Amino acid sequence: MSFIRESGLEYPIVMSTHLTCIAIFGGLIVITDLRLLGWAFQDKSIADVVNGLRWWKRVGFIIMFAMGFTLFGSKAADYYPNPYFWVKMLCLVLILIHAIIFRPLVYNHPENLDASPVIPTRAKVAGALSLILWTAVLCNGRLIGYYEPPQQKGHVVAAAGTK
């Protein structure tokens, strides 16, 4: 995929698409998580928010992931030594674990959360962890571009017979 990096137009298009999807997907995640925490959109049921945004979040995630994978492929050698890249990857693994744990407990049946007079703790934990992890992904993803590997100090060896 190095042709993307070397092209005049493809790389900016892929990067712009990735960033646009981050903004859209991220906004939908924030809306969902704030509702799970009970901090916003209290005039809407949790089920309406979760179910209403589900399709859009999936589409945004798929495009965002595809563009991110394409970006990685175009500069894999640059990303490999980058600690921010690895922290981002770790956070994405933690998000996958979050999804595996909380999908059956919270996201698959959000109408059960509305039946309770108080938002269940499991929903609040899911929302809080999601906000923290996605924020960490976003921040570390942003920092990837600013990382500069340490420069190796060159050794100057004096030629024999010189002072």
Describe the role of every protein-language-model region.
Residues 1-163:
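Polytopic transmembrane helical bundles with strong interfacial aromatic enrichment
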